[in-house]
């Protein structure tokens, strides 16, 4: 939760913060603070617990969380090959994940066996054991429609989550002016929730 990683299945299931219902966290004074509620309908006011997701401990230390869960799909199938990932996404009903490195595509299909088999026949891809290892040095968020331009923007080594807009890079990214504006907002939130600067000192909030 503190890292905010949603995993490869975000295309189908959404972000991890969307499953957080309630949390207890320690604030900058060491006091336990409750936010959210055990059910969605019980939540009122500012949804502080979701703000803590992905904050890396800079806004508070998560101590306990209540999350919404989903049943494990009866069938999961990874496939890979060379094709247009955007055309592939338009053909499939609800793929759990589509990864693309500018050449190869990896897709995860989940659900009832008959449905997965039917979807697999539409892909023209071959079965594989799983996806490649995601580069973990840099992470970039783009509008999904801009992912087509990635081969022009970066050399080899990146991996994009089609339909989500996340790009995993083998090198750190440089912040542009729009990112600096967002950092100003996050710095203000940091100052309000951690005026003493005790929470994960030295860690950037953005």
Feature roles, as predicted:
Residues 62, 69, 115-117, 199:
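Hydrophobic positions within alpha-helical membrane elements
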Residues 1-96, 104-106:
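FAD-binding subdomain of flavoenzyme oxidoreductases
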Residues 78-98, 117-120, 139-157:
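Short amphipathic alpha-helix segments
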């Amino acid at each position: 939760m503190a890292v905010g990683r949603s995993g490869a299945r975000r295309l189908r299931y959404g972000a991890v913060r969307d499953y957080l219902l309630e949390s207890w966290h320690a604030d900058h004074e060491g006091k336990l603070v409750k936010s959210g509620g055990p059910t969605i309908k019980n939540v009122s006011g500012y949804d502080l617990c979701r703000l803590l997701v992905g904050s890396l401990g800079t806004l508070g230390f998560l101590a306990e969380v209540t999350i919404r869960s989903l049943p494990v799909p009866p069938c999961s199938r990874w496939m890979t090959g060379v094709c247009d990932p955007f055309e592939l996404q338009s053909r499939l009903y609800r793929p759990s994940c589509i990864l693309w490195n500018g050449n190869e595509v990896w897709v995860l299909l989940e659900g009832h066996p008959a449905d997965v088999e039917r979807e697999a026949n539409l892909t023209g891809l071959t079965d594989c054991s799983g996806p490649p290892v995601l580069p973990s040095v840099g992470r970039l968020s783009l509008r999904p429609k801009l992912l087509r331009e990635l081969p022009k923007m970066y050399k080899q080594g990146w991996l994009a989550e089609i339909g989500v807009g996340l790009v995993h890079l083998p090198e750190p990214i440089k912040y542009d002016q729009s990112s600096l504006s967002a950092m100003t907002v996050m710095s203000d939130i940091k100052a309000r929730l951690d005026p003493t600067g005790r929470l994960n000192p030295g860690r950037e909030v953005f």
